[in-house]
Amino acid sequence: MAAEHLIRFAAGRSKIRVWDAGCARGQETWSLAMILAERMNQYGFRNLKIDATDHDSQNHFGAVVTQGTYSFRELERTPRHLVERYFRTLYDGGREFCQVIELLRQKVTYHYHDLLSLRPVGGNYCLILCKNVLLHLQYEERVAVYRMFHEALTPGGYLATEQTQKLPPEVAHLFEKAVPDAQLFKRVEQLAGRLNQQSVNTISGGTER
């Protein structure tokens, strides 16, 4: 669902940036990359860049995501036709495993990143994914991270979170629901609201004088 909204939103853009915040071993990152490779036109996919990040102090995930290597068991839930199209089979010391093809690997960059730094890894993202991370944060931390995501999104960009994670009321004015049955939100711009409030204040001030 997030991919379909991204494709429509990003049509004609020269830069299409996606941030997978909390990518773990990268399965979600590559699933999204495969979906976009299947459904985007050639121009759009050429302009796609995905930042995959995780707070992985033991560096368990970086090499896995960068190399895109997985066992067949890890890909059991991936549709067979996608595995055949976007993975190649490799052998190492009698061990058989799969590697994401170069076409997709060149679209993804892994970064070590702590969401609680409240410093975005980049900016002007058309889509930010954050699944199975926010639920581990304290309430005040979640509010701060949502504000950071709003800052990192391009105007009108999308934020997708886990289905069980509700938007805190403190940041409800920063996002609007894109669909009724999923946690997919669209960035709301604040400029118009500020200008309207300034106009109200000016009118009120003039009346009092």
Question: For each predicted feature, which ranges?
Answer:
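Class I (Rossmann-like) S-adenosyl-L-methionine-dependent methyltransferase catalytic domain
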Residues: 56-61, 86-90, 96-102, 112-122, ...
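Conserved AdoMet
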Residues: 1-19
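Conserved SAM-binding loop of SAM-dependent methyltransferases across substrates and taxa
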Residues: 25-43
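A short glycine-rich, Lys/Arg-flanked "PGG" loop and its adjoining helix->strand segment in the class I
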Residues: 143-155
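Extended basic-aromatic, gly/pro-enriched interface segments that bind polyanionic ligands
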Residues: 43-129, 133-136, 141, 167
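Conserved class I S-adenosyl-L-methionine
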Residues: 14-31, 49-51
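A structural alpha-helix within SAM-dependent methyltransferase catalytic domains
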Residues: 3, 33-37, 150
